[in-house]
Amino acid sequence: MFTLKKSMLLLFFLGTINLSLCEEERDADEEERRDNPDESEVEVEKRFLPLLAGLAANFLPKIFCKITRKC
């Protein structure tokens, strides 16, 4: 029973350390994002362009069909 408690305590301790390291890294990443607004603009462009390409792929054939009347 004592070894089980010791093992559980060790796992809890290691998990707590791991969690605190992850939080520190996440905080550092958030500070970098606040310091560099250009990166956030690039992320927005990356999200926007695939959406725009998908919409164009759906609507361009329909528009072309209506213009040329060759459906």
Swiss-Prot record:
Statement: the UniProt record of this protein carries the keyword Nuclease:
no
Pfam families in the record: Antimicrobial_1, FSAP_sig_propep
Q: Name one GO biological process term.
A: hemolysis in another organism
- Identify the keywords attached in UniProt to this record, alphabetized: Amphibian defense peptide, Antibiotic, Antimicrobial, Cleavage on pair of basic residues, Cytolysis, Disulfide bond, Hemolysis, Secreted, Signal
The cross-references to InterPro entries, in alphabetical order and at most eight, read: Antimicrobial_frog_1 (IPR012520), Frog_antimicrobial_propeptide (IPR004275)
Q: Which residues form the signal peptide?
A: 1-22
Q: Which domain of life is it from?
A: Eukaryota
Q: Does the keyword Disulfide bond apply?
A: yes
What compartments host this protein?
A: Secreted
Q: In which tissues is it expressed?
A: Expressed by the skin glands.
Q: List all disulphide bridges recorded for this chain.
A: C65-C71
Gene Ontology CC, one term: extracellular region
Chief site of localization? secreted
Which residues lie in the propeptide?
Answer: 23-45
* Family affiliation: Belongs to the frog skin active peptide (FSAP) family. Brevinin subfamily.
Function, as annotated, reads: Shows antibacterial activity against representative Gram-negative and Gram-positive bacterial species, and a very high hemolytic activity.
Please identify the protein, giving its name as recorded. Answer: Brevinin-1E
Q: Which organism is it from?
A: Pelophylax lessonae (Pool frog)
